[in-house]
Regions:
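Core catalytic region of metal-dependent phosphoesterases/phosphodiesterases
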Residues: 2, 11-103
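Short acidic/polar alpha-helix capping motifs at helix-coil junctions
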Residues: 25-28, 65, 137-143, 181
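N-terminal short leaders/motifs
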Residues: 42-63, 156-184
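Conserved beta-sheet core of the metallophosphoesterase superfamily
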Residues: 94-97, 103, 107, 112, ...
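Conserved histidine-centered catalytic loops in small-molecule metabolism enzymes
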Residues: 231-239
Length: 239
């Protein structure tokens, strides 16, 4: 099985280097791999499947092209938890839940649930993921939702700037707990923007995906081997 994992692209402009490299990556890799997993925060903000922005249109086309050639799985992050069935049907992606296991030994998550020390964030997450809140929010006009999304982004940046770095990282006990509970040998997640390879309890592995900021980050799985890759966002993917 040849798989590709990515997260935290935070796409917000179809003319940005991040989006251009993402589109090139999908075009190139979809012809080679069996499955592509996007583990949350594909976009900077998603306010509903009726979004008709240039980004939404370009993203739909890009994912459509990829899903015609390989399976693409999409997990919610803290910025794009409002991707729903309508978007999945339009693009051909398969929406997957947090704590997803494509294999018995492999566990995938966005990563925010692991940041248990950030109690303020966990309380907000619980509210935003609630059925009632989402129903009321999606009943608003697209313009109202976009305004809320911009305000939420602004407040999030301000609050994170005042938080200790340690509480925004994955909690060691939470990592051990989810891996043990799911009998996983390898955990792959994003969210923290701290890419790296980590050993858990001597015989297990944790792979942290990076944000597409200074470079683009991927994890590639071929058979049982996992490799973390970084590539330039300044030039065409694969060159």
């Amino acid at each position: 099985m040849h798989r590709l994992f990515m997260s935290d692209l935070h796409l917000d402009d179809p003319t940005s280097s991040q989006f251009l490299r993402f589109n090139e990556c999908l075009t190139s890799e979809a012809a080679e791999v069996d499955e592509i997993y996007i583990l949350g925060d594909l976009v900077e903000m998603w306010v509903g499947d009726d979004d008709d922005s240039p980004l939404a249109q370009a993203l739909t086309q890009s994912l459509n092209n990829a899903t015609a050639r390989c399976s693409v799985f999409l997990m919610h992050g803290n910025r794009d938890f409002l991707f729903k069935d309508r978007f999945a049907e339009r693009t051909g992606v398969c929406l997957i839940e947090d704590m997803h296991q494509p294999d018995p030994n492999l566990l995938l998550c966005h990563g925010d649930l692991l940041c248990t020390d950030d109690t303020e964030y966990q309380a907000l997450r619980k509210q935003l993921r609630g059925v009632q809140w989402q129903q009321e929010f999606l009943a608003q006009s697209l313009a109202e939702r976009r305004a809320f999304g911009e305000d939420l982004r602004r407040r999030s940046k301000q609050e994170n700037a005042n938080k200790a770095e340690s509480i925004m990282d994955a909690n060691t006990e939470a990592i051990t707990e989810v891996m043990t509970h799911n009998s996983a040998q390898t955990l792959i997640h994003g969210h923290t923007h701290r890419p790296g390879l980590h050993q858990v309890n001597e015989n297990k592995n944790r792979i942290v995906l990076g944000a597409w900021e200074g470079c683009g980050w991927l994890c590639r799985q071929q058979t049982e081997e996992f490799e973390l890759e970084c590539f330039s966002l300044a030039r065409r993917y694969g060159t």
